[in-house]
Amino acid sequence: MPHQQILMLFGLLPVATNISTWWNFGSMLLACSTLQVLTGFFLAVHYTANINMAFSSIIHITRDVPYGWLMQNLHAIGASMFFICIYIHIARGLYYGSYLNKETWLSGTTLLIMLMATAFFGYVLPWGQMSFWAATVITNLLTAIPYLGSTMTTWLWGGFAINDPTLTRFFALHFILPFGIISLSSLHILLLHEEGSSNPLGTNSDIDKIPFHPYQTYKDLLMLAMLTTLLLMIVSFFPDIFNDPDNFSKANPLVTPQHIKPEWYFLFAYGILRSIPNKLGGALALTMSIMILLTVPFTHTSKLRSMMFRPLMQLMFWTFAATFLVISWSSTKPVEPPFTTISQAAALMYFLFFISKPLMGLMENKIMKT
């Protein structure tokens, strides 16, 4: 297709005039996923999915492969950038009522689950101490499922403990899932353009729209330039900022790290898991911390779509954002008072947001009537 025709297609795509920078994170996520697939391919070429050689193959990539250190750091830090963008993208959807486009929201939540699974499998691949123990702790949660738990865990591990078959299948899953993510992302974008993007006011945009190109393309390019600058600065100057010191040691099943914790982007879910002193209860809470997003489109009761003109709801939303950060912070601390109490209070507040959101909507409707 000639260059002008592609631009014409973008030019014919109508977009609301007043969409803010928060709407740029979708295109940034697309850029992140492209980066992850490309760097991931070059890493997979040199990686060896064997428990005796995996750790050494990572060292080989960073030391001996030309620009291997760059590929490895771009892939690891790119994952963090991906999660920063996706959490902002979800927060924007919650704040401005984008979830009322139900199909788009449900496909997006499925994408989040797939992304979290992919990131978890990827974290296991270097076969460092924290990789091994994080895999042990999380896969062990399957044993909490009544009747089927033990069988499912053995099936997932490929044996009676985490071993070579586990690493091989995790590598296979880590390689194949991104293609599922790309397919579902295409569906997500397709469903979005059935109705079109919402806007900060939460009103119908049909009366005031502009062409996507050149206005939004340049806006997207500016944000992409900022994201790329931030990514390259971290890769160049602080490459180990998101890494756990324990993961620089090879996996040893006989030595348990003092404090097992996942990557920062899973800390909120891990904090919710840890706040319940019961295996099955914790596993259910962990699952619900993500699955509860699926309920949001069906529990919207307010007559207003966006939170822009709902001060009480804004207060609740920013309390929820602070709660998310508090859970993440408390998860990095040892399992002892006061951190356990903080985790439990924050986990309760996390779920209370989703429970009180429809009630707040009904209350606001009553206030508007009077």
UniProtKB/Swiss-Prot annotation:
Coiled coil segments of this chain: none
Residues that hold heme b b562 according to the record: H75, H174
InterPro entries with a match to the protein in the record: Cyt_b/b6_C, Cyt_b/b6_C_sf, Cyt_b/b6_N, Cytb/b6-like_sf, Cytochrome_b, Cytochrome_b_C_euk/bac, Cytochrome_b_N_euk/bac, Di-haem_cyt_TM
GO molecular function, one term: metal ion binding
Cofactor, how bound (note): Binds 2 heme b groups non-covalently.
Membrane topology: Multi-pass membrane protein
Record key words, sorted: Electron transport, Heme, Iron, Membrane, Metal-binding, Mitochondrion, Mitochondrion inner membrane, Respiratory chain, Transmembrane, Transmembrane helix, Transport, Ubiquinone
Cofactor(s) it depends on: heme b
Protein task: Component of the ubiquinol-cytochrome c reductase complex (complex III or cytochrome b-c1 complex) that is part of the mitochondrial respiratory chain. The b-c1 complex mediates electron transfer from ubiquinol to cytochrome c. Contributes to the generation of a proton gradient across the mitochondrial membrane that is then used for ATP synthesis.
Subunit architecture: The cytochrome bc1 complex contains 3 respiratory subunits (MT-CYB, CYC1 and UQCRFS1), 2 core proteins (UQCRC1 and UQCRC2) and probably 6 low-molecular weight proteins.
Name used for this protein in its record: Cytochrome b
Species this chain originates from: Chilabothrus subflavus (Jamaican yellow boa)
